[in-house]
């Protein structure tokens, strides 16, 4: 039990030998401001994922061979190789957004939830320590003051997202940018009753956001207990955003 919080950051799960039949990728693309639309779209297509989750995607989310899509929502979008039979925006507050989509796959239906919780608005200089104690103390107070309203927004957002998870008649996959670390309220509430796929099959580091001095984990993939995870990895070979893509494979019978 004591090792679990550490394993949410660094984990060495045994390799699963079963062959997957579902592959997903989730990526906060930062409005394509770093990698550019073409390179990001090319990368996502080359992953050959069955379902692509994108956050902060902008409007140029054009990827060939994905006939089914949800691009009518602000900030969050999805591409699927198989049919989307239902989709619905989930009420959010602030600058966050989320939706669910029910997708036909391998003779059954799964519900996927794409999450982008309201971001914390910090300038890098606000969280950078300095030598002066009083200045650091003032910085901490200012950061805490800014945290409280965002936490309240997250509570509202999560309540609506949980409704889509809890009421689902189908197995569920939740993926996206939670803008929260693994020991947070957001992690526990959105993951309640689900499996953290990194804990199940992840190997190495789970950190996905690399824009600060120390990388942190704020991108996640959770799944229902009857969906079997096969693999999970953070792709650090590309720097097309301030987030690394997260890729997971599953076996759905």
Question: Where on the chain are the PLM-derived regions?
Answer:
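Alpha-helix-centered segments that form part of catalytic cores
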Residues: 146-168
């Amino acid at each position: 039990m004591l090792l679990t919080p550490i394993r949410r950051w660094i984990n060495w799960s045994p390799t699963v030998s079963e062959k997957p039949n579902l592959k997903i990728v989730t990526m906060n693309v930062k409005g394509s401001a770093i990698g550019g639309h073409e390179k990001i779209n090319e990368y996502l297509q080359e992953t050959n994922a069955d379902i692509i989750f994108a956050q902060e995607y902008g409007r140029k989310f054009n990827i060939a061979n994905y006939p089914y899509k949800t691009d009518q929502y602000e900030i969050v979008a999805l591409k699927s190789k198989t049919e989307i039979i239902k989709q619905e925006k989930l009420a959010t507050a602030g600058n966050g957004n989320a939706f669910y989509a029910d997708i036909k796959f391998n003779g059954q239906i799964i519900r996927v939830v794409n999450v982008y919780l309201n971001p914390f608005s910090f300038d890098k200089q606000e969280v950078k320590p300095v030598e002066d104690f009083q200045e650091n103390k003032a910085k901490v107070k200012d950061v805490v003051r800014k945290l409280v309203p965002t936490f309240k927004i997250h509570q509202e957002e999560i309540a609506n997202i949980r409704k889509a998870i809890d009421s689902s008649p189908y197995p569920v996959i939740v993926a996206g940018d939670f803008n929260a670390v693994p020991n947070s309220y957001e992690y526990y509430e959105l993951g309640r009753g689900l499996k953290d796929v990194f804990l199940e099959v992840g190997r190495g580091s789970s950190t996905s956001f690399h824009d600060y001095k120390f990388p942190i984990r704020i991108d996640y993939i959770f799944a229902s207990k009857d969906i079997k995870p096969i693999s999970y990895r953070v792709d650090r070979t590309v720097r097309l955003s301030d987030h690394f893509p997260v890729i997971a494979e599953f076996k759905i019978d």
